[in-house]
């Protein structure tokens, strides 16, 4: 198998969607599966690398085939968002689609907004929204709320690597934030408003980057379907290794590759400690963890 698939190969790699507002992440995955069928390509496993709220637009990495084994690493990566905090009303969902729960006539100045941002940079404790996909005793929090239950969501420590004010008007402020996994932008917006002694909600949310994947690499669903109908879906595919740009490649011999494919440890490896991508020529063999001079398989690939 080569790294560049032919028009009839099963797809193994990443398609980066520019998800539109109003579409759920699961719906987006279903659309990719439909595109694969339209293109007449072999059926493969498909999954996304990080839920994006229906309200939000932007970068949604979709893993195909063997790349689904790496989706968990995409979930753990940092994300970059642009979001608008509309002042005046807080909602139960913390976005524009929810019911108003609190209101205030107070509007902060630009200077006041900028003065509180330092409070949210670095590691902070955050309470996720009750309208979220977080599981509580096996059931999503949002489903429990809709069923009429009173829900308490536990707080968590997250990291805001960067937070800047991008635009401001008397009724709203737009920010750019680079955040760690597990961060809820809706909660961040709520907390910024509270720090300013007012109320607010997210009126706009766009993911600009997810791990190594950027908006420049993302395509719309319309473009995806167009390429599928033209039999050119493979041209939209990024290689499996594109999701691991911060993980070094480790060249292995054919004998070593065979051992790794059988799940065996390699002894006497000269490589950086930590995660490495074992490669036989141009073919991904396994994601391995190196400790000392020993390597063990974390994820093996069937190529």
Swiss-Prot record:
Catalytic activity: uridine(55) in tRNA = pseudouridine(55) in tRNA
Alphabetized CDD domains for the sequence: PseudoU_synth_EcTruB (cd02573)
EC number: 5.4.99.25
GO molecular function: RNA binding; tRNA pseudouridine(55) synthase activity
Keywords: Isomerase, tRNA processing
GO biological process annotation, one example: mRNA pseudouridine synthesis
Residue positions of the active site: 53
Cross-referenced SUPFAM superfamilies: Pseudouridine synthase
Function: Responsible for synthesis of pseudouridine from uracil-55 in the psi GC loop of transfer RNAs.
NCBIfam families: TruB (TIGR00431)
Family to which this protein belongs: Belongs to the pseudouridine synthase TruB family. Type 1 subfamily.
Name of the protein described by the UniProt record: tRNA pseudouridine synthase B
Organism: Zymomonas mobilis subsp. mobilis (strain ATCC 31821 / ZM4 / CP4)
Taxonomic classification: Bacteria, Pseudomonadati, Pseudomonadota, Alphaproteobacteria, Sphingomonadales
